């Protein structure tokens, strides 16, 4: 896990869960119905 991300990089999270900065929410891929939590490089 990453303290910056609040979630594992690339972790699938519920669609209404907001990824914490400095992250952004990837679209529904590759997790149908879910968002993918991504860290900025």
UniProtKB/Swiss-Prot annotation:
Keyword Iron-sulfur: no
Role summary: Peptide with unknown function. Does not exhibit any effect on human ion channel TRPV1 in a Xenopus laevis oocytes assay.
Protein name (Swiss-Prot/TrEMBL): Peptide Hact-SCRiP1
Keyword Disulfide bond part of the UniProt annotation: yes
GO cellular component, one term: extracellular region
Source species: Heliofungia actiniformis (Mushroom coral)
Subcellular compartments: Nematocyst; Secreted
Signal sequence range: none
Lineage of producing organism: Eukaryota, Metazoa, Cnidaria, Anthozoa, Hexacorallia
UniProt keyword annotations, A-Z: Disulfide bond, Nematocyst, Secreted
Expression sites by tissue: Expressed in tentacles.
S-S bonds: 5-37, 12-31, 19-38, 26-39
